[in-house]
Regions:
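Hydrophobic/aromatic side-chain positions at a characteristic register within alpha-helices
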Residues: 26, 32-34
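TPR-repeat structural position
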Residues: 38-39
Length: 262
């Protein structure tokens, strides 16, 4: 009897038992990992770390599991990333064929444009050109001849409309050429126009010049498609570039996780 009492006393003094809640979170994280639910596994590990920091033995087990979760979650993200990047690359190749490359001697930089939209005398006319720069950025150039005092342009279809921000005359982005005026909108300022054209591909739209006076010009479905093609090409190029950068980040994360597992 005395021996049994002594064993009980030693067991009680040897350290407290683990918390059932902490063990439950770790078991849940392990089960989620086995089920390939890496988001849930991460959430449970985070909850365990925050709620039961004093459970050092269980935290050590969690520390061993976490890099495995990160590794598999990252591999899944890389696979998804690669699929999206391949899709963007195919889209870029296809839409590039619909565009023309223009680089004249007087130009500092060339651009891609729909062949139907290219007009060497563009700055002596009234309209817009959707262009894609050498690095894949979509931008709009508007020309009004004679002058309208315009500072922005809008595309409309019924009650739906998209417009650029106003770009006041500054002699640089908004400047004068002979009897006309030209505005080169930045990629950020042009995005709404490109997106609207892509959403309304195949439709006739109204182009409106806004400023001191207004002028509305009808765009044929072919003209709208030219804007949409340029925007789609730019979106694919910039999307693939962004995904390539994201892949490099994911590869670095994967290496860190594997180093922790080694």
């Amino acid at each position: 009897m005395a021996l049994s009492s002594g064993l009980l006393l030693l067991t009680a003094c040897g350290g407290k038992s683990e918390d059932a809640g902490a063990r439950g979170l770790l078991d849940g994280a392990s089960q989620a990992f086995d089920a390939h639910d890496y988001t849930l596994a991460t959430q449970l590990l985070d909850s365990l770390q925050k709620t039961f920091p004093a459970e050092t033995a269980i935290q050590r087990e969690a520390l061993a599991l976490r890099p495995k979760v990160i590794e598999q979650a990252t591999l899944l993200k890389i696979s998804t990333n690669d699929s999206l990047m391949a899709l963007d690359q195919v889209t870029a190749e296809q839409t590039k064929k619909t565009l023309r490359w223009v680089k004249e001697p007087r130009m500092v930089e060339g651009f891609h444009i729909s062949p139907a939209a290219y007009n060497p005398d563009f700055m002596n006319s009234t309209g817009i050109q959707a262009r894609v720069s050498e690095i894949g950025e979509f931008y709009i150039v508007s020309s009004a001849n004679p002058k309208l005092g315009h500072t922005s342009v809008a595309l409309g279809a019924g009650t739906s409309e998209a417009a650029t921000p106003a770009v006041p005359y500054d002699g640089e982005s908004n400047y004068r050429v002979g009897s006309g005026e030209v505005i080169t909108f930045s990629p950020q300022q042009s995005d709404t126009i490109g997106s609207f054209a892509l959403q309304n591909r195949g439709k006739a739209l109204t182009l409106t010049f806004r400023g001191k006076s207004r002028k509305a010009v009808k765009l044929t479905p072919a003209q709208v498609n030219g804007i949409a093609d340029a925007y789609a090409y730019s979106s694919a190029i910039t999307g693939a570039r962004r995904l390539a950068a994201e892949r490099r980040k994911l590869e670095a994360m994967l290496q860190v996780a594997r180093n922790q597992m080694a």
